[in-house]
Structures are given as structure tokens and as C-alpha cells.
Amino acid sequence: MIEKHIVLEDIDPVVFYGVSNGHLQMIKSLFPKLRIVARDNVIRILGDEEEKAKIEEDIETMRKHIVRYNTITEEDILDIVKGRKTKADAVKDVLVYSVAGRPIKGRSENQQQLIDAFDKHDMIFAVGPAGTGKTYLSIALAVKALKEKAAKKIILSRPAVEAGEKLGFLPGDMKDKIDPYLQPLYDALEDMIPAVKLQDMMDKHIIQIAPLAFMRGRTLSDAVVILDEAQNTTPAQIRMFLTRMGWNTKMIITGDLTQIDLPHAEKSGLKEALSILNHVEGISVINLDKKDIVRHKLVTRIVNAYEAHDKADKR
């Protein structure tokens, strides 16, 4: 009999084998005609040829499940081996699972529209107040595309202008000055990708995070590209960014038109782009509002209070 070797690629073997090898022992019990030996990320199988073909197919399904969701349960394994409906079929609305195992998916009608728009359009503008999940959901869509090999890399960017601070007046070298502006993007990625794997992807430039100015002169192909806080771009900056789009690339531009930190005389590039590109074929504009806020319930009350204050000021 020929021994079959299966390599667990793109996943943490510990997740596959389970706590105290619980998953592995379960798989062995489901295939009593086979001798199964696991070492690191390689599984060696000896025994009945038909059973070997079946387990190879099932292990690949389990591997893909872990790639997408970062986790797998004994119930999932049983469903896969027994040919019942898998978790992947049952929760198609889940984009990815967080490192902690929490499902990440659209939680409102407008968030679902953003997800649907990503499937149908190459460029999406997601506009709405703080807490509506526009950035987090966009990054989840990018991570999903990367895991499913629909994209080769993720590129995340922000304009380095916020809260009235000028980079030249901040202490430290350029990295020290820039990193605080990009931290929300790191936070979202760390929630979805294990730390060691994330660092490896960044070292290999599979995931890139950079200020908007670093995009100049580049053509961004085979990627999901996200521009966050786009309300703080100038018209020239956002025009430069949008024209970086290359083949097999999707762009998501997020922003909140109520939080523009540009000097008063400067026009928001996002505001101008929305008025110019609103009806261009291939571009989708998704407007999120306070009904989509998924942070602490106080955030909704704060947004409502400021909206009322702004309306009173205009009278």
C-alpha cells in the first residue's frame, strides 16, 4: 500500500488538530480502516484506497473551512465527514471569523449593501458617521478576498492629517509620526489575522499599510485597496489615489463628511469625488447612517445630539 502525505497549507496545525489533539482523535475514530499519523503540518495516511481518497477530500474541506473562519469545531468535522450541510453552507453571510472566533458579517441593511456592492463593483464609496462599521467591514471583505485567493494583496491607506496636527511638529522619526494615524487599520487586521501570521504577511508585503502620499506613482494591481478617512483628502490627493487602480483590483473608499479635519479653506476630496463620480458605471456609493452604528449604544446618542446641535446652529 502507498502511504499518502497531506500537507496542511495556510493554516495553523494546532487549530486543525484541536486541543490535546481532540480533533485528530475524532478524525481517526471516523476512519477506523486507516492508520493516521500527524507530525507538524504533515498528515501521513496508510490503508484502504477508497477511504484514503475520502479522507483527503474531507481534510481539504476542513482546511478551507479553517482558512476562511480561523476555527473549526467537532460538529463541523462530523458534518464534513458525514456529508451533511457544513458550517460554510449554513453561514454564508459570515465574511471571516475573528481570531477569538467571533463571526464578522453585515449587521444592518446598509452594511449588507456594502458587502453586496463589493461582489458587483470594482470601486465602492462607503460614507457614514463613526461607528457604522464601514472601515472594519471593508477590511473584513479584503481579508476574505485574500484568504480565498481572489486578491494577492491588501493595501490600506489613510491621509496623515487628523485632529489639526502637523507631522512636522510631532516628535520621533517618520515611522513614529505616521504609525498613530494608521493604528486603527492595524487594530482591525489584528482582530482578524493571528499576530504571527499578520507580521509574516506584512514582512512579505502581502499586506501593506501606508500613508496616502506613498501611493503616488504606483499602479495597484491584483489587490483590495482601502482608503480610510477619505474626507481628509484634498481633491488632488483623492484623484491621485483613484487613478492608481490596476487590473484585478477593487477599491473601497471610506469616510465621514461630518468629521473633516482639513483647514476651512480646503475642500474635501471625498465630497468632490462623490459629486463627480456618483453616477459613473462600475462605482457604487453606499451611505450608512446612525441606524448602522454597532459600537456602544452611547455612540448613537452622541451622534444624535451632535446632529441636533448642528441643525440648531444652522437656524
Name each model-derived stretch:
Residues 31-32, 193:
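A broad structural signal for alpha-helix termini and local helix breaks/kinks
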Residues 8-10, 38, 47-49, 158, ...:
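Flexible glycine-/small-residue-rich
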Residues 97-227, 231-315:
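Conserved helicase motor core of SF1/SF2 NTP-dependent helicases
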Residues 11, 21, 49-50, 232, ...:
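Short, surface-exposed acidic/glycine-rich loop or hinge patches that mediate macromolecular interfaces
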Residues 29, 36-91:
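Interdomain "pre-motor" coupling segment immediately N-terminal to P-loop NTPase/helicase cores
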Residues 32-36, 285-286:
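A short linear hydrophobic-aromatic micro-motif
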Residues 1-14:
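N-terminal presequence-like segments and adjacent domain-start helices
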Residues 11-31:
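Short amphipathic alpha-helix segments
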